[in-house]
Amino acid sequence: MAVKVVMPKLGMAMKQGEVSIWNKKVGDPVEKGESIASIQSEKIEMEIEAPEKGTLIDIKVKEGEEVPPGTAICYIGDANESVQEEAGAPVAEDNMPQAVQPVKQENKPAASKKDRMKISPVARKIAEKAGLDLKQLKGTGPGGRIVKDDVTKALAEQKKDQAKPVSEQKAQEIPVTGMRKVIAARMQESLANSAQLTITMKADITKLATLQKQLSPTAEERYGTKLTITHFVSRAAVLALQAHPVLNSFYQNERIITHPHVHLGMAVALENGLVVPVIRHAEKLSLIELAQSISENAKKAREGRAGSEELQGSTFSITNLGAFGVEHFTPILNPPETGILGIGASYDTPVYQGEEIVRSTILPLSLTFDHRACDGAPAAAFLKAMKTYLEEPAALIL
Amino acid sequence: MTLAIIGGGPAGYAAAVSAAQQGRNVLLIDKGKLGGTCLNEGCIPTKSLLESANVLDKIKHADSFGIELPAGAISVDWSKMQSRKQQVVSQLVQGVQYLMKKNQIQVVKGTASFLSERKLLIEGENGKEIREADQVLIASGSEPIELPFAPFDGEWILDSKDALSLSEIPSSLVIVGGGVIGCEYAGLFARLGSQVTIIETADRLIPAEDEDIARLFQEKLEEDGVEVHTSSRLGRVDQTAKTAIWKSGQREFKTKADYVLVAIGRKPRLDGLQLEQAGVDFSPKGIPVNGHMQTNVPHIYACGDAIGGIQLAHAAFHEGIIAASHASGRDVKINEKHVPRCIYTSPEIACIGMTERQARSIYGDVKIGEFSFSANGKALIKQQAEGKVKIMAEPEFGEIVGVSMIGPDVTELIGQAAAIMNGEMTADMAEHFIAAHPTLSETLHEALLSTIGLAVHA
């Protein structure tokens, strides 16, 4: 009996999941626990593992197609077995709320003759490896069959096109799917549905920089984690948020919900998007524990191992463009949060201290807040608190 | 719109039929018999005689199949072999004549030469005439290359045509050149009882194909009694003593023989065409053409052996049809990526695409799949279990880039390889393919499987 593999439900709110890549094709043998596909939903990308050893006997969801959780995406069984399709809608998983019952999927008939593509096996393999869109290819073989020459010519064209000055290049169309789609929707929703604005401040972190240099090697030796300026800033944010809970809040249903705890979202850039892993109860963590969590979460996120729970529920977010040399910027709120802090690139500059000019290290901070939840003065007070923590850093260590 | 075609060989007559089918008014000029070298002096007559040798071989081994023949029961009648050959040739020539008639192609016997771009002078038995044509296709073919110090005399120094119609089976024969033609003739006459000596300048026979194939073949040829001297060169000939004097390294050897067959290649037959008068570019290597078979003068086409290159009848058919179609307004181009190369020796050799050496030089670590006929049921039944099938697959995508075979009936098997390669199939597809059993085709299937490590009987 073939085993059905379904689109998993990653988080309560998940309505659709996309199969981004099939790592196996029909007919391939699979080992139990072997990765058979990558799926994407919201901001999560996840590998699907084979539940049983066997042969991948049928693929129901094509690459790039979105289906509700619980929908069968493929079947694993004996090589010569055929799939017994279940009648009706795919069965929802037990823990799936009724509201998100998956829509019944149409059983599409096998591709009709018209849809069938005339292409030689060699041409198909080369095109697929190079990621060429087969539909864009024109076949010059018998009866319009796409042959190897057509593919190699198209690849050469593509290369030539890329080598051309930008003005002569053809515009590229990239369909917005998966993570990009989620980011696009979230960011637009954020800007459309809130009254956000950004204020900036500069903190003199000369002392902090010295402290960080002193502590980091010891921290690494003792706890296995380097201490970075970001870690100190995060700690400062946690402390400042506790003193100014209006920025540690959600603006939801015409209510402002302030949180007693700080779940800190730390934005992590990925190759094809970004995720915001969440450090729960950051207020309970010491500086070193916070640093460890931040490092561990970022690593997991980059490796695509972050689970859906770890990417949800933040009460305040921090984003850092300092590594790219950006100083001040306007971060976009991660709704329903009402505050997000942007860390810029620190720089050394002469600063007056009394009549004396000294070399100081300056860290640019940008705070975006939702004016519906909080006015300028309390937001500035929060930033001021941050500045104070950063300029007198001894308190951060405690 | 008249299309004049010079030469009625495979390139010329195929072009004539194709053009006529496309509604053209076609004039075909040939100085000899229709069918050209292939039909009259090449492919067909040689293979016909070779078939006689094959039958003889079979009969000689009749006892191993359980058939007893009384002593002295076998005798070879060369003149009957000749007349059988002639019958086959005549029937095929008549076939071509019928095709000309059926397609209303005007055939003129004579020698053609250009007077200008569109004017041809035809000199025939009934005198001279001048014909005009809107387009001209040159398919004048090729002729054997002579050795300057030993020109063909038709008496003792022979070309391949002369050797086909000897009055008797020679008791001894020196063959200069161990390429395709030399090897086919060596096998023929050796199996009919001649003492054959091959003198080849390269370090092995059939230098164009892979070494493993050539070596296997040479062993077999030597078993048949042929003396093979590679890395050797004919120095001179002594006509009166009927002796060929040849060198291997610094040493000189003498071989006395009834005949010397010079088979060192063929050259385009362009003399007398007066190509200059039409402004057509050419060199001793042939007439350069583009992918539509057009010469530098766009309304003058050339194809077949006249353009040099592949020099195979089946390539000529293809070229002729492309030339005729393009001349008739169709935008077609030549595709000679997959031209089978057959050698009718015993055992036969058939190759297509790249040799292993070529494939390695282009793709580096190619996947090689081999299967031996000694593990094939049908080959054992036929008692022809010598040889192998070798397949070269490109390493990344598994494209079959070359097939080389030596063994029973491989000149027929190569058709399957041609279909596979022309269809751009990949090695892994062999898994989903069933070869009939017991057949020689199974070797091809097993060799394909072996490129992906899945051969069953190896």
UniProtKB/Swiss-Prot annotation, chain A:
The active site is at H371, D375. It comes from the Bacteria. Pfam families: 2-oxoacid_dh, Biotin_lipoyl, E3_binding. Its EC number is 2.3.1.12. Residues 2-77 form the Lipoyl-binding domain. The modification N6-lipoyllysine is found at K43. Keywords: Acetoin catabolism, Acyltransferase, Lipoyl, Transferase. The keyword Transferase applies. InterPro entries: 2-oxoacid_DH_actylTfrase, 2-oxoacid_DH_E2_comp, Biotin_lipoyl, CAT-like_dom_sf, E3-bd_dom_sf, PSBD, Single_hybrid_motif. GO terms for biological process: acetoin catabolic process. GO terms for molecular function: dihydrolipoyllysine-residue acetyltransferase activity. Its cofactor is (R)-lipoate. It catalyses: N(6)-[(R)-dihydrolipoyl]-L-lysyl-[protein] + acetyl-CoA = N(6)-[(R)-S(8)-acetyldihydrolipoyl]-L-lysyl-[protein] + CoA. Belongs to the 2-oxoacid dehydrogenase family. PANTHER family: DIHYDROLIPOAMIDE ACETYLTRANSFERASE COMPONENT OF PYRUVATE DEHYDROGENASE COMPLEX, LIPOAMIDE ACYLTRANSFERASE COMPONENT OF BRANCHED-CHAIN ALPHA-KETO ACID DEHYDROGENASE COMPLEX, MITOCHONDRIAL. This is Dihydrolipoyllysine-residue acetyltransferase component of acetoin cleaving system. It comes from Bacillus subtilis (strain 168).
Swiss-Prot record, chain B:
The keyword Oxidoreductase applies. One of its GO terms (cellular component) is cytoplasm. Signal peptide: none annotated. It catalyses: N(6)-[(R)-dihydrolipoyl]-L-lysyl-[protein] + NAD(+) = N(6)-[(R)-lipoyl]-L-lysyl-[protein] + NADH + H(+). Binds 1 FAD per subunit. Its cofactor is FAD. It comes from the Bacteria. GO terms for biological process: 2-oxoglutarate metabolic process; acetoin catabolic process; pyruvate metabolic process. Pathway: Ketone degradation; acetoin degradation. This is Dihydrolipoyl dehydrogenase. It comes from Bacillus subtilis (strain 168).
